[in-house]
């Protein structure tokens, strides 16, 4: 992360005028001789990889090829030293490929610094991560290992070459005893939001495949931008971890930026509730957290504002201070922080707490251990569930802005008596439901209608907002997606040129900022498997894009050669274009997106705190205003669909 002064400068520019800051920035010129050597090395490694595609350790080799390929093709060598590092990666990748060809994979049994990779569900790209494997590790040892996830700070030049090389040289800030430390790449520099958030969970799942993990001793830690990552991940997924230790960073957008001139749109103000950790402070009731700051570091602001929000929830934030220091750890503070964190880790996570305090603003984040919010009364208003197991046959819960809730206690939870029915007090209403099963598990689903709670029926076929199907537009890029390229003639030339430009930009930006090659197919090539497994990003209009033509009649927008109609509003089709997210009428378990990639643009690149969702569920873009580094054009209308994916007269304000 950049120093605060530079971050504030970026915000000022962002507020006053569009700023075009490319990320990554253009690299240095690579001498022709080095280019030839690197290309030859890539070709040799690619030839070896061809015969290894079915090997389960294929990603552990492929990541070396991708790292060098991206740096070379994308002009992403930023220092002369990186050219040497790239050659080293090709050498190591070649050695690993040769080992796999012999049926060996020695790095899978190694201790110390190990780099590995996995294939992401989002775009099929290989993503790297680093490990510090303790010297006590052995594949034959019957032991479940504590895992500390470490989130790195910001570096605009942190390409895969630097990440992999550094992870083979540098053990990092903390190396707890008998602990596997997982160093996340996080798909570059995004403070673990969007695809960067998914990277953490995918990398952790990959670690689980290869190492025995103690599920009750997983911790999240990081510094600077990595501290921001920890605040985000921990606040939204509090009961997944034993402890959190954020250092510096940021915890929200507007107060961190301290720019009174910047006035967000009404929908941006609502969308901040997606990513602001401050809005989820109540969830730290479930998770021990210790914040670190240098006493002279302006980025103490993150912990200061989290402490304020936690105080409003009746909690006092534990803090460790580095004395007479700015943006760094002191040796003494590291010792104290390690002592405290290790004590919490030794105790481990309370897997099945009797009491849950949970807040959310969206069904994207709908679970806090055994409490699951299935439906909201209104997205982007605060929802709460305070639930408690009173005794072995009764549960009490109080809710706000919740339309449906489930209680799901898994095997061995054993909080309720299997020989007794359970009485549930839900917002003062008493309901008697079947008791726990003999494995200790218990599940009950409730839905509110006309102010009254009742046991809920299965409504899987009902069109409504639900977890992972709630928007906004950016949500489509947290799971498998395919960009669907139009092959027909556009309804209007201006719109056709704009959609092509925006599609090209989205593909380019995905590679640069989220480090993958966006899957792209012609509209004539979309298969049943694509419909079943992926969100479809439809570019063009109902005439140019055959898939869009198939679903158009079932969307809450009408689009002809003359007009775009959104409820009671009409926009000229010659100079307007809709962007939106909606359940795919051909497979309502997946999304379609019309004419949009992820929604923050270049003006957000000055500070990771600006890298947030910029557009809601839908918008109409006026193309008489050209795209800039903030918007795809003038936003003539925008809004959120209702809880049944219906168009609201208020636009969801």
Walk through the language-model features, giving the residues of each.
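Amphipathic, heptad-repeat alpha-helical segments
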Residues: 17-61
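A domain-start/cap signature at the N-terminus of enzymes
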Residues: 18-28, 74-145
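Gly/Ser-rich "nucleophile elbow"/oxyanion-hole loop immediately N-terminal to the catalytic nucleophile
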Residues: 136-142, 193-225, 235-241, 283
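Active-site machinery of serine-nucleophile hydrolases
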Residues: 144-211
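Mobile cap/lid helix-loop segments that gate and shape the active-site cleft of serine hydrolases
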Residues: 153-167, 239-287
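Short beta-strand immediately N-terminal to the catalytic nucleophile in serine-hydrolase-like folds
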Residues: 220-222, 247, 292
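C-terminal catalytic histidine-bearing segment of alpha/beta-hydrolase fold enzymes
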Residues: 292, 296-395, 401
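Solvent-exposed alpha-helical segments and adjacent loops
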Residues: 396, 407-653
């Amino acid at each position: 992360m950049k120093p605060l002064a530079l971050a504030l400068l970026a915000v000022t520019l962002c507020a006053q005028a569009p700023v075009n800051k490319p990320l990554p920035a253009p690299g240095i010129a690579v001498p022709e001789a080095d280019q030839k050597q690197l290309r030859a090395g890539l070709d040799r490694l690619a030839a070896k990889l061809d015969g290894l595609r079915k090997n389960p350790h294929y990603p552990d080799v492929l990541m070396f090829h991708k790292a060098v390929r991206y740096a070379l093709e994308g002009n992403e060598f930023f220092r002369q030293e990186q050219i040497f590092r790239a050659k080293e990666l090709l050498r190591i990748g070649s050695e690993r490929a040769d080992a796999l060809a012999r049926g060996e994979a020695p790095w899978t049994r190694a201790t110390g610094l190990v780099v590995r990779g996995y294939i992401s569900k989002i775009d099929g790209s290989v993503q790297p991560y680093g490990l510090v494997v303790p010297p006590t590790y052995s594949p034959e040892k019957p032991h479940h290992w504590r895992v500390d996830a470490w989130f790195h700070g910001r570096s605009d030049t942190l390409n895969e070459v630097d990440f992999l090389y550094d992870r083979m040289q540098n053990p990092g800030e903390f190396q707890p005893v008998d602990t596997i430390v997982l160093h996340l790449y996080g798909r570059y520099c995004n403070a673990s939001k969007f695809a960067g958030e998914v990277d953490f969970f995918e990398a952790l799942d990959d670690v689980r495949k290869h190492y025995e993990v103690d599920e009750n001793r997983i911790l999240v830690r990081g510094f600077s931008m990595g501290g921001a990552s920890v605040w985000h991940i921990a606040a939204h997924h509090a009961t997944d971890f034993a402890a959190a230790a954020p250092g510096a960073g940021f915890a929200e957008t507007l107060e961190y930026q301290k720019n009174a001139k910047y006035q967000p749109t009404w929908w941006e103000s609502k969308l901040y509730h997606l990513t602001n950790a401050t809005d989820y402070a109540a969830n730290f009731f479930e998770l021990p957290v210790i914040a670190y700051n240098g006493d002279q570091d302006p980025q103490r602001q993150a912990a200061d504002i989290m402490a304020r929000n936690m105080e409003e929830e009746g909690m006092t934030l534990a803090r460790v201070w580095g004395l007479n220091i700015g943006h760094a750890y002191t040796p003494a503070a590291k010792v104290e922080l390690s002592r405290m964190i290790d004590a919490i880790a030794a105790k481990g996570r309370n897997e099945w707490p009797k009491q849950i305090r949970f807040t959310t603003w969206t069904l994207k984040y709908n679970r806090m251990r055994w409490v699951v919010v299935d439906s909201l009364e209104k997205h982007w208003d605060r929802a709460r569930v305070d639930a408690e197991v009173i005794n072995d046959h009764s549960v009490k819960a109080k809710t706000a802005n919740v339309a449906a809730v489930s209680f799901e206690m898994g095997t061995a939870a054993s909080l309720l008596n299997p020989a007794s029915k359970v009485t549930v007090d839900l917002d003062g209403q008493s309901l008697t439901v079947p008791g726990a099963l003999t494995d200790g598990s218990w599940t009950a689903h409730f839905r509110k209608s006309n102010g009254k709670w009742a046991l809920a029926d299965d409504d899987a076929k009902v069109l409504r907002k639900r977890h992972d199907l709630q928007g906004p537009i950016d949500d489509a890029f947290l799971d498998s997606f395919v960009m669907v390229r139009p092959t027909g003639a556009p309804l209007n030339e201006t719109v056709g040129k704009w959609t092509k430009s925006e599609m090209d930009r989205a593909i380019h930006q995905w590679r640069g900022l989220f480090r993958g090659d966006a899957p792209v197919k012609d509209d004539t090539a979309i298969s049943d498997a694509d419909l079943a497994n992926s969100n479809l990003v439809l570019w063009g209009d109902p005439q140019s894009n055959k898939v869009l033509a198939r679903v158009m009649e079932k969307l809450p927008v009408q689009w002809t050669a003359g007009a775009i109609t959104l409820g009671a509003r009409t926009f000229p089709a010659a100079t307007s274009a809709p962007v939106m997210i909606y359940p795919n009428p051909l497979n309502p378990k997946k999304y379609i997106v019309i004419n949009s990639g992820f929604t923050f643009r270049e003006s957000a690149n000055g500070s990771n705190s600006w890298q947030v969702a910029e557009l809601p569920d839908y918008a109409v873009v006026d193309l008489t205003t050209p795209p800039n580094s903030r918007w795809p054009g003038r936003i003539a209308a925008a809004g959120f669909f209702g809880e049944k994916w219906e168009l609201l007269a208020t636009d969801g304000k």
